Amino acid sequence: MYNATNSRSRMFRYEVVGLRQTAETEKTNYAIRNSGSQFFNVPYDRMNQFMQQITRWGGKIVSIQPLNGTVAPLAATTEPAANNGAAPVKEKKVDIPVNIYRPNNPCIGKVISNEELVREGGEGTVKHIIFDISGTELRYLEGQSIGIIPAGTDANGKPHKLRLYSIASTRHGDFQDDKTVSLCVRRLEYKDKETGETIYGVCSSYLNQLQPGDEVKITGPVGKEMLLSDDPEATIIMLATGTGIAPFRAFLWRMFKENNPDYQFKGLAWLFFGVAYTANILYKDELEAIQAQYPDHFRLTYAISREQKTPDGGKMYIQGRIAEHADEIWQLLQKKNTHVYMCGLRGMEPGIDEAMTAAAAKNGADWQEFLKGTLKKEGRWHVETY
């Protein structure tokens, strides 16, 4: 399991400054000095808790070093900084990288880890895969995708076609050292209508079976539709089903797990996440840790179709949750810096349109006119469904 198997045995050395002895620190086994850097060895599956603890103690994390690895600088995870009444600070515009690597000239990434995200009792298998891209020119932004070219050939002896996957890490990578890119990949499987045979997706199966050290051909990045708004005071509404969570994990890490000098999020992020079972909530611990640490800036709403019911007794899909909150969402959409991002199954779209049509009508508006003439025209409605 992600954060529970291979990663659990990995240790990281934290360098922390600014700690002070308090009643709380005296209850721990840590020897707290009143000045200088202090170092802590922390297992991977306790990193979130440890960073929250350091924040409570008033400290600042200045680097993380994988034991037997290299130093990866990391700022402290603290409450989003107040703006002290100043005008909103806009993130410096960056060039959007596109097709740095093409299918005829891919770069080579090396697998660092490949870990299961679905917990016991869940459906299917989904892996969080981290690739080492150091030594390449690959760079990317939150909301983009990369292409993967599976090894081997198809039935006709030709190379397999590439498949695109949404990136699940920020531009700085999971270790925040600008040397990795991460994916969230579900192994595709379906029944052949004629034979009943189970068919597995070529690329998703290839990725799910990779081992640390394996080399993979990577292309891209591609995509401009899902780029995260650079307004640190924006309202960001995210609608995800299944592995559609990938770009939103990147968004949330950028908002809450990194302390970028040019982007300190002070707005509202609201994630609606639809899954079949609780065991299928991908990155559950991460999401709930962020919610606990930033309750004023992050809202988390699950739609668990096999476990939750709508008021009329039906299964609770994500569109049902949108219907419950449609009036509030409508009001949020009147703000010029509210963006909606949708990623996952296309089947959620009609129900969301229906819910928002009803909410708009209560306010004397036509949802389709508002959607096309305002949200899409202003670049505030972002959709990547399949």
Swiss-Prot record:
Chain ranges of the FAD-binding FR-type domain: 104-228
Compartments where found:
Cellular thylakoid membrane
Keywords carried by this UniProt record: Antenna complex, FAD, Flavoprotein, Membrane, NADP, Oxidoreductase, Phycobilisome, Thylakoid
Q: What top-level class of enzyme does the UniProt entry assign? A: oxidoreductase
Q: Name one Pfam family in it.
A: FAD_binding_6
Q: What is its EC number?
A: 1.18.1.2
- Entry annotated with the keyword Membrane: yes
SUPFAM superfamilies linked = Ferredoxin reductase-like, C-terminal NADP-linked domain, Riboflavin synthase domain-like
Binding of NADP(+) occurs at: 166, 186, 243, 275-276, 305-306, 315-319, 344-345, 384
In terms of InterPro entries, this protein maps to: Cbr1-like_FAD-bd_dom, CpcD-like_dom, FAD-bd_FR_type, Flavoprot_Pyr_Nucl_cyt_Rdtase, FNR, FNR_nucleotide-bd, FNR_plant_Cyanobacteria, OxRdtase_FAD/NAD-bd
State where FAD binds: R163, L164, Y165, S166, C184, V185, R186, Y190, V202, C203, S204, T243
- How does the record classify its membrane topology? Peripheral membrane protein
User: What domain of life does the UniProt record list for this protein's source?
Assistant: Bacteria
Q: Which GO terms describe its cellular component?
A: phycobilisome; plasma membrane-derived thylakoid membrane
Domain spans labelled CpcD-like:
9-67
What terms describe the molecular function in GO for this protein? Answer: ferredoxin-NADP+ reductase activity
Q: Which reaction does it catalyse?
A: 2 reduced [2Fe-2S]-[ferredoxin] + NADP(+) + H(+) = 2 oxidized [2Fe-2S]-[ferredoxin] + NADPH
The similarity annotation says: Belongs to the ferredoxin--NADP reductase type 1 family.
**PANTHER family annotated for this entry?**
PTHR43314
Name of the molecule in the record: Ferredoxin--NADP reductase
Organism equals Thermosynechococcus vestitus (strain NIES-2133 / IAM M-273 / BP-1)
